[in-house]
């Protein structure tokens, strides 16, 4: 049985979503890799991405009743992943929010199924955690319960303190975060594929400097 986490990283490389080299993060750090989920931008790649999300969510064991995708990136992720979960026999409703409230038609900021029960938030990454915090407020305001967060990649690096953005969400809200892959999985990919050998030491150094356990 293949490791779907490694398959996801290889797929991300093939789509140029994951790149190795020298990059500057929003925090001003020099990073040896870059991950841009926005480049999953056609039907085939979005379909495959949703399959990885569905598998990761099921294997996480998180109990949930529906999906919520925060605008804007989470909208397509929630819809596509709901379809892939249905193919695996897990048929759940989904919803998303608008950035701006609408005063006609459906109205309000929420679109899709009513937020009820245990709601799993789905997004691409957790950076500052702002999107997650806003999603939690929306979910709780509707009387529902946040169940956890599903993301594509956990960079496993410190924020302003000693914790990563993912760890801060887990600690502050007591919610599980289920990434398809993490920095540890990326490190394994580099170790097992000699063609990427030149990036092994830079990633090791970066992890030593900024990484969390």
Curated annotation (Swiss-Prot):
Keywords: Glycosyltransferase, Magnesium, Pyrimidine biosynthesis, Transferase. Its EC number is 2.4.2.10. InterPro entries: OPRT (IPR023031), Or_phspho_trans_dom (IPR004467), PRibTrfase_dom (IPR000836), PRTase-like (IPR029057). Coiled coil: none annotated. GO terms for biological process: 'de novo' pyrimidine nucleobase biosynthetic process; 'de novo' UMP biosynthetic process; pyrimidine ribonucleoside biosynthetic process. It comes from the Bacteria. Belongs to the purine/pyrimidine phosphoribosyltransferase family. PyrE subfamily. Catalyzes the transfer of a ribosyl phosphate group from 5-phosphoribose 1-diphosphate to orotate, leading to the formation of orotidine monophosphate (OMP). Homodimer. HAMAP family: PyrE. This is Orotate phosphoribosyltransferase. It comes from Neisseria gonorrhoeae (strain NCCP11945).
């Amino acid at each position: 049985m293949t490791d779907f986490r490694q398959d996801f990283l290889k797929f991300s490389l093939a789509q140029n979503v994951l790149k190795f080299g020298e990059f500057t993060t929003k925090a001003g750090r020099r990073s040896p890799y870059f991950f841009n989920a926005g480049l999953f931008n056609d039907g085939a790649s979005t379909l495959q991405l949703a399959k990885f999300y569905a598998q990761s969510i099921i294997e996480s064991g998180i109990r949930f009743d529906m999906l919520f995708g925060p605008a804007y990136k989470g909208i397509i992720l929630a819809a596509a992943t709901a379809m892939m979960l249905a193919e695996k026999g897990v048929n759940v409703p989904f919803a998303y929010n608008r950035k701006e409230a609408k005063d006609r038609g459906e109205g309000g900021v929420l679109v899709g199924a009513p937020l009820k029960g245990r709601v799993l938030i789905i997004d691409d990454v957790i950076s500052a955690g702002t999107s997650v915090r806003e999603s939690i407020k929306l979910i709780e305001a509707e009387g529902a319960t946040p169940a956890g967060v599903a993301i594509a990649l956990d960079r496993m690096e410190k924020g302003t303190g000693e914790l990563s953005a993912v760890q801060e969400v887990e600690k502050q809200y007591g919610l599980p975060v289920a990434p398809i892959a993490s920095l540890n999985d990326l490190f394994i990919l580099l170790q097992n594929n000699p063609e990427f050998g030149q990036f092994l030491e830079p990633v090791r150094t970066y992890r030593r400097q900024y990484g969390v356990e």
